[in-house]
Design a protein with these regions (language model features):
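Acidic/His-rich structured neighborhood in mature extracellular/periplasmic domains
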Residues: 1-150
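A cross-kingdom marker for long, charged
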Residues: 117, 121, 126-242
Length: 242
């Protein structure tokens, strides 16, 4: 009952959100005209953080509103959800998540992600796609960092990349290596507590952005469908300074 109350307080109505979504989706339809706008379906399943907070099923865009109550919400604290997860459980991330966690899969081909590079490029595509659909959204919201973490990533991604390359981790198939750089974590090992997690995703976004900048003849759709991670890396000419 308390959860429903919190949802009602946070989302007295969804008019603004629906308007923003429709606007962003019309941008999507210009690039992918064979698609149709999904129906928004909201529910409150009861804080299941193991399940995506937004997902597509047929033509329904399902949104779990109890996953967007704000990082400081007492229910999240009582439920023991760690801060690095709850930081993104805020309604300012809802529109981003609709594209990053759901709509993007309409354009991402199924691919077995074998190496860290595969995963990095895959995650980078999701972020680049979302940024293209939401050009007015602050970049830190698209990446899912607060301002401090975003600044750290911006200043240090060259160091993280150098570490990955110098330690021969780029083509690693080890699950723990892929997890270390590409999945949810309070920080990125071995860069200390000030670093954000998911630095591999951030680097992937940088590589894909460089690829699109250096290959202006490539369309968004072509890039999304290109499953050759090495090809994207090579043609990105990505060479950050340490």
């Amino acid at each position: 009952l308390e959860l429903y109350k919190e949802v009602k307080n946070t989302f007295p109505n969804l008019d603004d959100f629906k308007q923003q979504f429709t606007q962003a989706y019309s941008r999507y339809l210009v690039l992918f005209p064979n698609d149709k706008i999904p129906t928004i379906v909201t529910s409150v399943p009861g804080l299941d953080t193991q399940w995506p907070s937004v997902f597509l099923y047929e033509n329904d865009l399902n949104i779990y509103l109890d996953m967007y109550l704000g990082a400081d919400n007492k229910i999240y604290k009582q439920s023991g959800i760690p801060l690095y997860i709850s930081e993104r459980m805020d309604k300012k991330f809802l529109l981003v998540d609709c594209f990053k966690k759901a709509i993007v899969y309409k354009q991402l081909p199924e691919k077995t992600l074998v190496t860290l590079l595969d995963r990095v490029i895959y995650e980078g595509k999701k972020l680049y796609f979302t940024q293209t659909m939401l050009p007015n959204e602050p970049l830190e919201n698209i990446i899912g960092y607060n301002e401090e973490k975003f600044q750290w990533a911006e200043q240090n991604y060259g160091k993280v990349w150098a570490y990955i390359v110098e330690n021969n981790l780029l083509y690693s198939k080890e699950e723990n290596v892929i997890r270390q750089f590409a999945e949810e974590a309070p920080f990125t090992n071995p860069f200390g507590n000030n670093s954000p997690g998911r630095m591999g995703q951030y680097i992937g976004w940088k590589i894909v952005s460089a690829y699109m900048q250096n290959n202006s003849e490539v369309t968004l759709e072509e890039m999304m469908k290109n499953t050759d991670s090495q090809n994207i890396l090579n043609n990105s000419k990505f060479k950050p300074t340490k």
